[in-house]
Amino acid sequence: MKKIYRFFAVMALLLVTMTSKAQNDLALTLLPNFSYCNMYNPAIPVGSRTVIGLGISNINFSVLNTGVNYDNLFTFHNDGSVALDANKFVNSLDEHDNIIGTNFSMDVFRVGKRIGRLFIDLNYRVKFDAGLHYSRDFLGFFVNGNGNYLGKDNPANLSVGADFSLYSEMALGLQYRINDKLSIGVRPKLLVGFANLSVNNDGTKIYTDENTYSMTADVNLNISAATALDMDDISRLSDFTTYIEDMDTLIIENLFDIEENIGYGIDFGVSYTFNKHFGVAAGVYDLGYITWKDTKVKQNCKENMVINDALFNSMDDVLNMNIDFTDVYETLVDDVWGNDSIYNGGDYKTSLKTRIMLQGYYELCPLARFTAISQLYYVKEKFRPSLTLAYSGSILRLLNFTASYTMSEYSGNSVGAGLGINLGPLNVYVVTDNVMIATKYNASTMELLTSYDNANIRLGMVLTLGNRDKKKK
């Protein structure tokens, strides 16, 4: 078997087990009478005159998994027994385009104020965003062994890439109401990168001799890393072990450090209300990049590299998520990459995951609003479409609710729901874009995290003062 992609297989599994972005997390913007209606389009009018959020105003955990599906991992017999079905699993994967993504975000503070026709919205947010993509052969080689890849003309094409980013976002939203029907909005952002790891391993091929079954590999691995912390003491790959263990202090110690790893982003949009029943909006969200400095770079480009060790000793470790990342990392360094020197690299850029959105709504009455949202989401160098249909309503502006159905090319179909309560100036909400995940609360870790392509929860409390519509009257 092989050891060259041990690290990437573990990272794929770790991504699923981490505190985790359902890529269609729209439920929050669908809740009536809530100030986050303009989260993805700064032109959508905010009903409140003043908005205040501190710490827990907007917290999001989510995960995307388009490849590892629980029903495709196992065969379920009539007697209730379950058996791992390796061939079924591998054949269910896309040849090249399998994605795992995870996200955590939290608004540290938010202050918004309406002054005449202008609404000013200042927001500071911390984000962790990670994505990994891999080919069918990447897991097929591990599951089925090298017997399926015999001969010079039949290599295992192992394609894997990863991008992990921890950064902050300071955004200034400006929304201007041109008239009673038309509003425009723009939200420039200052981005500060805390840490990034970018891995590109699209050129690795594993060859198995059809007579001797000996294996060789052509490896083309490129890794770039950067952080806001001092990396002067990091000169070898093994030095990252201690660095990773101290990562939990990164946000606290460098929360407002803006000396390096600077980036810029922007959201912009337009909204138009035809009458009290119909409205449309269009916008672009998260168009931008971060430039990473003080980088460390590792490259491994080898041909005919002999490999002969296994990826994992036991499949039980995979199924039970019993994986020690530090041990795997150290083994990888010693046996595959070699604990040789890494060197200082040049600046590099990573892009935000941009969305292009078009939406329209019909409101029969406050108790019945129907919305359609079409979006293109930039994932793995492709714009991927999705469509969300939603119902939302409000009872006396006190109880607000929404239900939605999303159809997505890359994250599957899902049913979302949300509930918000306005207790005077205090607004409390909880939303999800996949309510079905709640049916797996008592399931095993593997079943919980692989039963659906995406899952998320977003919750928070925010203070709002004044009602724009009442003031107009």
Where are these regions (language model features)?
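Subset of outer-membrane beta-barrel
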Residues: 23-473
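Bacterial Sec-dependent N-terminal signal peptides
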Residues: 1-26
